[in-house]
Amino acid sequence: MAHEAQLKFGNSKEYRVIECEYEFVQPIKDNGQPAGFPSGGLIHLVVVSPDDNDIFLHDWMQSATDQKDGQIIFTVEDKALPSPKVLRFKHAYCIRLYEYFNAHSNIQMHTKITISAAEIAFGDSGSVVFKNDQK
């Protein structure tokens, strides 16, 4: 059970993740067997907006060609548990950015982004890899 998550881009940028969703699906035949290759792999994130004038995510979103590599690290408070779960992505575009602020709530300003990656890897050292054909 993850208690914290961080979105990291190399050694330069890091954001605290509040929500993370991703999904992969396969088409199926009438009998329930797979009928094609898996698709999907969009990563939907809600991160705490930085307090400074950080425009890293905005710059990424505004570019139709800028690709980033990064990772989402899910950690637990109990250090006795195994190493954290890591989702790595490569050659990714930011295809959606939405910011939310409400002065009447105690919730910090949030940034929602959707990432479309050519490759998503899971497991120890990326032992399971999902590849999108972005030709």
Please report, for each region that a protein language model flagged, where it lies by residue.
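Glycine-rich, low-complexity intrinsically disordered segments
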Residues: 1-135
